[in-house]
Amino acid sequence: MLNMKSFALVMLFATLVGVTIASGPNGQCGPGWGGCRGGLCCSQYGYCGSGPKYCAHNTPLSEIEPTDAGRCSGRGTCSGGRCCSKYGYCGTGPAYCGLGMCQGSCLPDMPNHPAQIQARTEAAQAEAQAEAYNQANEAAQVEAYYQATQAQTQAQPQVEPAVTKAP
C-alpha cells in the first residue's frame, strides 16, 4: 500500500522526469479504479501519467475496460493521441498501438511514440532471432556435410598404385 510519504515521492519523481499525473484519488487506475482521463496512460503499477514509464508496458487485454465512451470500432479514430485497438477500444501502449494491434488511427506520424518504439524493437528482435537461427542451421548443415564427407573418405578402401617391375 502506498502511504502519503511514498505518494509524495512518486509525485516529486514524476515532476522531475516530466510526466503528468492524473487528478483524482491518488491518480490510480486499472481494474477496480477505471481508466485515466485526458488521454493519460495507466502504468503497469496502476497509476495515471504520461511518458514511457506509464505508456510503454503491454496492458493485458483482460485489463482493458470496455466503455461506450472509449469505443472506436467502425470509426477507427480516438481523441487525445490514443490508438484504436483491433478490438475496437481507444487507448495507448502496445495493446492498442502495437504492430498488428491497431486499426484506424495508429500513430504513423509519431515514430517516437513508446508503443511504436516497442513494436519496432520487438520486430527487430524477432528478425535477429530468425537470422541467428538461420545461421546456426546453416552452420549445422555445413558441419554435417563435412562429417559425412570425412566418413565417406575414410570408408573407401585405400588402393595402392600397382608397381610394375622392369624385365
Swiss-Prot record:
Signal peptide start and end residues: 1-22
SMART domains: ChtBD1
Residues that make up the propeptide removed upon maturation: 58-67, 101-167
Disulphide-bonded residues: C29-C42, C36-C48, C41-C55, C72-C84, C78-C90, C83-C97, C102-C106
Tissue specificity: Expressed in roots, flowers and, to a lesser extent, in stem and leaves.
Expression induction: Strongly induced (up to 70-fold) by infection with phytopathogenic fungi like R.solanum, F.culmorum and B.cinerea.
Any one GO MF annotation of this record: chitin binding
One matching Pfam family: Chitin_bind_1
InterPro entries xref list: Chitin-bd_1, Chitin-binding_1_CS, Endochitinase-like_sf
Protein name: Antimicrobial peptide 1
